[in-house]
Design a protein with these regions (language model features):
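Charge-rich, low-complexity N-terminal segments
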Residues: 1-150
Length: 150
């Protein structure tokens, strides 16, 4: 008798420096979030994106092949540089279940938290907690599209 197993899931948490002209950053990143949410939904990826005005922090999770393809695409994107993997590996269950991309833009508080966590060198758990906090109801994230059916 075969048991139904949940599909394999991997996750990737990274940080990078923005190369977007500051005058255009808010609009550019809003459009990026909308486009990414749609693409992520089609690939079965979920996650969250934080933008401080100077850097990005993003957590993505989903099927390993889809996540690998997205990692390659993100690593080649000219809107940022210095992509640093903070955490990666298999997941037992999704942390951002119905968010193809939860997104929160620039704020002083957010920028301070992100920069402090990156500077420590061991800030991956703190950053993951921050991303998850934004993805809970009334946590501050904006939906960039309708939630996926799960």
């Amino acid at each position: 008798m075969l048991h139904d197993r949940p599909p394999a899931l991997d996750h990737w948490l990274y940080a990078s420096r923005s190369t977007i002209e500051p005058a255009w950053a808010a609009r550019s990143v809003d459009l990026l979030a909308i486009q990414s949410a749609s693409r992520n939904a089609g690939l079965g990826l979920t996650g969250a994106l934080l933008f401080t005005g100077q850097c990005f922090v993003q957590a993505l999770e989903g099927p390993p092949a889809a996540l690998d393809a997205m990692r390659t695409e993100i690593s080649r994107d000219r809107r940022h540089t210095g992509v640093v993997t903070l955490a990666e590996g298999p997941l037992a269950h999704r942390r951002f279940g119905d968010w193809s991309l939860a997104y929160s833009g620039n704020s002083i508080y957010l920028a301070e938290q992100v920069h402090r966590a990156i500077a420590r060198g061991d800030g991956a758990p703190a950053l993951m907690g921050l991303l998850q906090a934004f993805a809970i109801p009334d946590g501050g994230a904006r939906r960039t599209e309708m939630p996926q059916d799960t």
